[in-house]
Regions:
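Specific alpha-helical transmembrane segments that line the substrate/conduction pathway
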Residues: 46-57, 93-133, 173, 255-275
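Membrane-interface helix termini and inter-helical loops of multi-pass transporters
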Residues: 33-41, 101, 105, 150-163, ...
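Specific transmembrane alpha-helical segments of multi-pass solute transporters/efflux pumps
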Residues: 27-34, 60-112, 122, 148, ...
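Hydrophobic transmembrane alpha-helices of multi-pass small-molecule transport proteins
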Residues: 59, 122, 131-153, 263, ...
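Helix-helix packing/entry segments at the starts of transmembrane helices
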Residues: 25, 48-50, 89, 108-114, ...
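Hydrophobic/aromatic residues within transmembrane alpha-helices
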Residues: 38, 47, 51, 99, ...
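Transmembrane alpha-helical segments that form core, pore/gating elements
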Residues: 33, 59, 119-121, 125, ...
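Glycine-/small-residue-enriched transmembrane alpha-helix faces in small-molecule transporters
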Residues: 2-48, 156-186, 206
C-alpha cells in the first residue's frame, strides 16, 4: 500500500461517516414532519406502539444473531433496559407526537435542536461533568433560542410565560431524552443492535398502557390508510435507518465528532416543514435557529478548550 493510499483511507472513512450522519439528521428531522402528518390519521400513543412493534419485528428478522449472543447480558440488566426503553423511546415519542397536535414542525425541529444543551445540563447534574465559561455562554444562547421560538418572538408572551402547549411539551420531551442519553453511560456491554432491539421491545411493552389510557379517554384513533403509511415510515426512517447510520458513523469517527452533525436536524426539519407542509418560516425562527446552533457551536468550542 502506498503512502497516498494510506492517507486516503481516513479521508474515505470520514466522507462515509459524514454521509451516514447526514442521513441520520435527515431522518430525525423527518420525524417532526411525520408527527404533524399523523394528526387526524392516527392517535399519538397508538403511533408509538405500532412504530416500536414494527421495529421489533424488523430487528428480530435481521439482527437475531447478535440478540441471541447478548441475551444473557440483556436479561441481567432487564430493569435498566425496561426503564430506558420506557423513557427514551416510548415516553419521549408519546409526548413528541402529542405536541405535534399543537405546534408546528418548524418549532419542533428548532427546539429539538437544543437537545445537546439538555444533555449538557443532565451530565452536569448526574456526573458533575466539568463546565467551562464558554459552555455556560453556549447554553444560555441555546436556551434563548428555545425561548424565542416558544414565545413566537413576542417579548410580551415571554414575559407572561405564554407558550404554546406543544412547545412546552417538546421541551419536556427533550429533557426526558436528555436523561435517557446521560443514562446510556451505564449501558450493558452488548452489541449496539442488541441494545437497540431490547430498548425497542421495552418501548413497545411500556407503550401498551399508554394506548389503553388513550382508549379510556376516548382519544384512540385507529390508523387510516395514510396513518398506516406513517407508521411504516417512522419505523423505518427515524428508527431503523437513523439508528443504523448513527452506529456506523460513530464506529468510523467516534461519538464526539459524530455528535456535532446532529446540529443539522433542526435545519432539515425546518426545510422539510416549509417545502412539504407549507409552514411559514418567520424572522424569529431564523433568529432562534442561529441562537440554537451558535450556542451549540460555542459550547463545543468550550469543551475542546477544557
Amino acid at each position: 500500500m502506498t503512502l497516498d493510499t494510506k492517507a486516503a483511507a481516513p479521508e474515505r472513512a470520514s466522507a462515509l461517516a459524514y454521509f451516514f450522519l447526514t442521513c441520520t439528521a435527515l431522518c430525525w428531522g423527518a420525524n417532526a414532519i411525520f408527527g404533524r402528518l399523523a394528526v387526524g390519521e392516527i392517535s399519538p400513543m397508538l403511533l408509538v406502539a405500532l412504530r416500536w412493534l414494527v421495529v421489533v419485528m424488523l430487528l428480530a428478522a435481521f439482527a437475531k444473531g447478535a440478540i441471541r449472543r447478548d441475551l444473557p447480558a440483556l436479561k441481567a440488566r432487564w430493569g435498566y433496559l425496561a426503564a430506558m426503553g420506557a423513557l427514551g423511546f416510548a415516553t419521549f415519542n408519546g409526548i413528541y407526537y402529542v405536541a405535534a397536535h399543537s405546534t408546528t414542525a418548524v418549532n419542533i425541529g428548532i427546539i429539538q435542536g437544543a437537545m445537546p444543551m439538555f444533555v449538557f445540563f443532565g451530565a452536569f447534574l448526574a456526573y458533575r461533568t466539568p463546565v467551562t465559561a464558554l459552555q455556560v455562554m453556549g447554553a444560555a444562547l441555546t436556551m434563548a433560542g428555545v425561548a424565542l421560538v416558544a414565545s413566537a418572538g413576542s417579548l410580551e408572551r415571554l414575559a407572561a410565560f405564554e407558550f404554546a402547549p406543544g412547545d412546552v411539551l417538546i421541551v419536556l420531551a427533550c429533557a426526558i431524552y436528555a436523561g435517557y442519553t446521560v443514562a446510556l453511560r451505564r449501558r450493558p456491554p452488548v452489541a449496539a443492535f442488541s441494545m437497540f432491539a431490547a430498548l425497542a421491545g421495552a418501548a413497545f411493552a411500556t407503550s401498551l398502557p399508554m394506548v389503553a389510557a388513550e382508549a379510556a379517554l376516548g382519544r384512540l384513533q385507529w390508523p387510516t390508510t395514510t396513518g398506516w403509511i406513517i407508521v411504516v415510515l417512522v419505523a423505518i426512517f427515524p428508527s431503523v435507518i437513523a439508528q443504523t447510520c448513527f452506529i456506523k458513523a460513530v464506529a468510523l469517527i467516534g461519538p464526539g465528532r459524530a455528535g456535532v452533525f446532529m446540529n443539522l436536524t433542526p435545519v432539515f426539519a425546518s426545510a422539510m416543514a416549509i417545502s412539504i407542509l407549507g409552514e411559514a418560516f418567520e424572522a424569529f425562527h431564523a433568529a432562534a435557529l442561529c441562537l440554537v446552533l451558535g450556542g451549540i457551536w460555542l459550547s463545543e468550542r468550550g469543551k475542546a478548550g477544557a
